[in-house]
């Protein structure tokens, strides 16, 4: 883990050096957000202590103006709803916010303002890696009790058992590298704007399940979903594979 953090982690982890000593959490989740509304800031799934959401608001240098405006609105929503706990050194893009209504803090990562945007070929993988690297650093510092880096997206509705499912695993279990949460595209009928969107969503989910079914039929050891928004990664194994790929998804 130390080798990964020293040689391969993103530079945002260096800004954590000034984090107050008394701050710690039970669980962590990483959310890369681009062009999202603030609806996902609702009450998080419960855990035995406080949870930490690492929110990486991001856009590429080629992003349209409307994307920049939506990202700024999301950052403003965090700053208005939550109480500031800590601000990293100027230019680092990190700040920590406490939810006054839930046992949850938000580590806000700015990768969308001028001079902090992702490169043109950077995408959700890059943003997810930034967040996961920060989570790994905090786990290594023993500020986060769980060794699982939970990864999800802003448009995902999480079950109440989200954190508790991983917390049930033995602390000493190091053979399990990742967890895949079951998923479905919910409320498509109510929220879709047209029958074409409904059909496209259903076909997309069918293709995901068909692929895994085909891999299972072929007796492949890789017969599982690899969707960034539905997984949790063991911190040690995350470091062994040198983190998430930086490329855009798709």
Locate predicted features.
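Short beta-strand-to-loop element that shapes/binds the nucleotide-sugar donor at the catalytic cleft/hinge
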Residues: 175-198
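Active-site-proximal specificity loops/subdomain of glycosyltransferases
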Residues: 5-8, 66-146
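Short beta-strand-to-loop acidic/aromatic patch adjacent to the donor-nucleotide binding site
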Residues: 139-159
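Donor nucleotide-sugar recognition loop
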Residues: 242-250
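N-proximal low-complexity "stem/linker" segments adjacent to membrane-targeting elements
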Residues: 1-52, 56-62
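A recurrent flexible, glycine/aromatic-enriched loop bordering the glycosyltransferase active site
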Residues: 212-232
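Short glycine/serine/threonine-enriched helix-capping/active-site loop
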Residues: 56, 111, 179-182
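Conserved donor-nucleotide/metal-binding helix-loop-beta segment in metal-dependent transferases, i.e.
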Residues: 160-182
């Amino acid at each position: 883990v130390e080798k990964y953090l020293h040689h391969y982690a993103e530079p945002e982890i260096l800004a954590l050096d000034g984090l107050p000593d008394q701050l710690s959490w039970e669980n962590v989740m990483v959310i890369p957000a681009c062009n999202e509304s603030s609806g996902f800031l609702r009450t998080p799934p419960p855990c035995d202590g406080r949870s930490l959401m690492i929110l990486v608001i991001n856009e590429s240098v080629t992003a349209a103006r409307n994307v920049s405006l939506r990202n700024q609105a999301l950052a403003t929503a965090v700053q208005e709803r939550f109480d500031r706990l800590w601000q990293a050194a100027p230019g680092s893009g990190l700040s920590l916010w406490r939810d006054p209504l839930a046992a949850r803090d938000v580590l806000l990562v700015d990768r969308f303002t001028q001079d902090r945007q992702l490169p043109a070929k950077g995408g959700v993988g890059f943003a997810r890696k930034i967040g996961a690297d920060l989570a790994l650093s905090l786990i290594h510092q023993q500020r986060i009790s769980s060794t699982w880096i939970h990864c999800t997206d802003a448009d995902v509705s999480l079950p109440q058992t989200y954190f508790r499912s991983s917390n049930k695993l033995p602390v000493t279990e190091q053979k399990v590298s990742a967890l895949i949460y079951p998923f479905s595209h919910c409320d498509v009928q109510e929220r879709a704007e047209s029958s074409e969107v409904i059909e496209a969503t259903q076909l997309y989910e069918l293709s995901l399940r068909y692929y895994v079914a085909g891999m299972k039929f072929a007796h492949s050891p890789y017969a599982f979903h690899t969707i960034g928004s539905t997984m949790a990664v063991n911190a040690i194994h995350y470091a062994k594979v040198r983190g998430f790929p930086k490329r855009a998804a798709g």
